[in-house]
């Protein structure tokens, strides 16, 4: 690599581990250029085992090691962590936060004037290198900081730079979205079992159907409605199934789920 990128994770959970593995796999950092801090022994052990990187129980040790800090703790832990590291954070460092609902203003306020901050919303498919990520730059973050965020999070999926005002919607859609999809997979699999299929076959058929459908949507660029029509023959089986879904209000329920999760994200950002 042309420049040594040192990365410190404040929090060593599953998402931090997935990110570290993605960065290493994409040759954005070597394992010895990464450190993760966490008070929980088991979390540190898992991070070290899976990412091959060093760990510590001290947030300040991670802070002093890294040029780029990834804040990967739960939202209700952010204030305490910022209070601990804020006095030692320098303008030469960049903080990237993946804490859901925690605003740039709160992050910048906790680190002091001049802090370079980026707020990021990945999702759990980062664990398999297939995250849908959006990020917003803080007022002091540079264009180069934005390029770095794009490079880092493209290593684990796709990434989009947006205005911060849209990140709550991202949380409601792609942040919470995997859970909606898993519920759909479970329900379709149950339907397959009810129709006589073995559970393992029904689940694998369903998951592959979702995967293949998503791949077609991404690779063809066609509107989902057009792709739906490609499957739907006049008077056939698919239109009967779609009719039942429409009668049950599935479309509206999914839209409402995104709206509800978006509003919850806004409340989290306000400390509610």
Would you name each region that the model predicts?
Residues 118, 167-172, 224-229:
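Short pre-catalytic strand/loop immediately N-terminal to key active-site residues, enriched for Gly-Thr
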Residues 2, 207-272:
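NAD(P)-dependent Rossmann-like dehydrogenase/reductase catalytic/cofactor-binding core
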Residues 19-20, 85, 188:
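Hydrophobic residues within alpha-helices
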């Amino acid at each position: 690599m042309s420049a040594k990128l040192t990365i410190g994770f404040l929090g060593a959970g599953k998402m931090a581990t997935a990110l570290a593995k993605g960065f290493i796999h994409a040759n954005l950092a070597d394992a010895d250029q990464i450190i993760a801090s966490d008070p929980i022994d088991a979390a540190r052990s898992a991070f070290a085992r899976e990412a091959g990187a060093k760990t510590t129980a001290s947030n300040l040790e991670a802070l002093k090691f890294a040029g780029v800090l990834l804040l990967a703790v739960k939202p209700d832990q952010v204030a305490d962590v910022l209070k601990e590291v804020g006095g030692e954070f320098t303008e030469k460092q960049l903080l990237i936060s993946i804490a859901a609902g925690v605003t740039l203003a709160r992050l910048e306020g906790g680190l002091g004037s001049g802090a370079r901050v980026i707020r990021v919303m990945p999702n759990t498919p980062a664990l398999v290198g297939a995250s849908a990520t959006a990020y917003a730059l803080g007022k002091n973050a540079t264009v180069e900081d934005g390029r770095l965020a794009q490079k880092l999070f493209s290593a684990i999926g796709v990434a989009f730079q947006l205005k911060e005002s849209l990140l709550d919607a991202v949380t409601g859609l792609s942040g919470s979205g995997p859970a909606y999809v898993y519920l759909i997979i479970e329900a379709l699999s149950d339907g397959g079992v009810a129709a006589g299929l073995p559970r393992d076959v029904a689940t694998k058929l369903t998951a592959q159907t979702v995967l293949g459908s998503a791949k077609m949507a991404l690779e063809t660029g066609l509107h989902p409605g057009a792709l739906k029509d490609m499957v739907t023959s006049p008077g056939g089986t698919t239109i009967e199934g779609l009719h039942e879904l429409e009668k049950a209000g599935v479309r509206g329920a999914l839209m409402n789920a995104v709206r509800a999760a978006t509003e919850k994200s806004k409340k989290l950002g306000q400390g509610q």
